[in-house]
């Protein structure tokens, strides 16, 4: 399996995460409760799979390899900036989950950042798929 195929396989798992995130923020906006343990699992998957595994594969291996194609350097830079944006959204989710655990009713910002994250994932995944076709 090529590196591109491996990253596309990751994207199939990311689609599953998108669906869970959408379900959670929809339920939160509807005033329903989501167990904090479930929210912690989402945060863990974002940290451990998306950031530590998927982004690492791209940033440490794939992008440096295809950066030799000069015409892709600008797109790689844009994708790296988006990875950092993703990390910042994830930090906000974690920050508000911590406050929620401490007893504050911060479901609205959690829902808002989850929605932002899901929109980001859909858009970013599409950009990466198009990038893989060019690489």
Language-model regions: role of each:
Residues 1-135:
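Small-residue-biased structural context
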